[in-house]
């Protein structure tokens, strides 16, 4: 990855609210399935904005920090996804998205961020990201002191 895109908590909340507004009316949804771990925080934000209490997870391992590896399903929510929103933080190459589509063919699959290779696999997303960009999510970062350039 040659570029980095830094996401702040404020940006994430703004994007999640924008996505939630597109998913109205909320009564059409039985619940949310968050893709662990990237979709957990966006899933909580959507659940709050839409007033949805039924939240489940599908746990898929596909990244080791910044290296993509073989998909492994650790836990899945039951059913075919009918009436459910499936949320992940991003769609990248589409590997996870293909697995999600196979597990939940009737779900409405959304992400906050989408890269070109995976974009056709989701029903909706908020932000376009170039394919060669690594996204730094706020839950992966800490706030640290940065000394002034002058050293004073």
Swiss-Prot record:
UniProt binding sites for Mg(2+): 89
Catalysed reaction, written as an equation: GMP + diphosphate = guanine + 5-phospho-alpha-D-ribose 1-diphosphate; XMP + diphosphate = xanthine + 5-phospho-alpha-D-ribose 1-diphosphate; IMP + diphosphate = hypoxanthine + 5-phospho-alpha-D-ribose 1-diphosphate
Entry's localization field: Cell inner membrane
Binding site for guanine: 92, 135
Origin species: Escherichia coli O127:H6 (strain E2348/69 / EPEC)
Gene Ontology molecular function: guanine phosphoribosyltransferase activity; hypoxanthine phosphoribosyltransferase activity; magnesium ion binding; xanthine phosphoribosyltransferase activity
Amino-acid positions noted as binding 5-phospho-alpha-D-ribose 1-diphosphate in the UniProt annotation, renumbered to this chain: 37-38, 69, 88-96
Domain of life: Bacteria
Membrane-topology annotation of the record: Peripheral membrane protein
Name this protein carries in UniProt: Xanthine-guanine phosphoribosyltransferase
EC number: 2.4.2.-, 2.4.2.22
Binding site for GMP: 69, 92-96, 134-135
InterPro entries on file: PRibTrfase_dom (IPR000836), PRTase-like (IPR029057), Xanthine_Guanine_PRibTrfase (IPR023747)
Keyword Signal: no
Gene: gpt
Pathway info: Purine metabolism; GMP biosynthesis via salvage pathway; GMP from guanine: step 1/1; Purine metabolism; XMP biosynthesis via salvage pathway; XMP from xanthine: step 1/1
Keyword Glycosyltransferase among record annotations: yes
GO BP terms in the entry: GMP salvage; IMP salvage; purine ribonucleoside salvage; XMP salvage
Binding site for xanthine: 92, 135
Pfam families, A to Z: Pribosyltran
